[in-house]
Amino acid sequence: MRRGGLLASLIFLLAGALEPAQAGQTHVAVAANFAEPAKEIAALFKERTGDEALLSFGASGAFFTQITHDAPFQVFLSADEERPKAAVAQGFAAPGSVFTYAVGRLVLWSRVLDVSKGEETLKAGAFSRLSIANPAAAPYGAAAVETMKALGVYDALQPKIVRGNSIGQAFQFVDTRNAELGFVALSQVRGVPGGSQWLVPQALYTPIRQDAALLKKGADDPASKAFLEFLRGPEAKAIIERFGYGLE
């Protein structure tokens, strides 16, 4: 009996040792402009590692506020470089974990107007609604304001500006024709059929360096660390470039 019991115990332990390791999960806060590439990267990450990245999309400013109020995110993919650095400075992210994963490009886009000569379109002002993301919460919104000020049209266009909570909502306003045109991320209109766009010259706004950070809740989590490492790798970079982002 004792030998049989010992053998059964050994078989049980061996079976447990041979079971595949349970896949990990990481909760990732993703700036809305990066939604589509993030989905592709997460799918490939799961295929390569077995780990799952659970993605939430929104405005970087809103995410930062949630992170400082104990939200369960483990990784932060911001649309700017300031908030990830602030997260480290305030003790909400791991020191040394911040890096630039993409450099965003701003476009003026419309479903109904020819905006290919964007500066002329903005100066003429022959439209009733111009969509931008909330500049206080979304870096692409701040870049839109900076662009309009550089062109000397901001004051004249202010009454026509409608603000989305995020760049995702700003895109939706234009896509659904609730605004005739709007400033959105190049990544959002890559591959979108129809419409007209003007790629805003980089000289008109501060480069949109989008930084990632390993948050305090993910500092000891293997899946969170693995996701950020994958984000820095060649397969993820190829996806990022395909959506129109620059790399550093």
Residue ranges of each PLM-predicted region?
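Bacterial N-terminal signal peptides
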Residues: G5-A17
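Sec/Tat signal peptide C-region and signal peptidase I cleavage site
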Residues: E19-A23
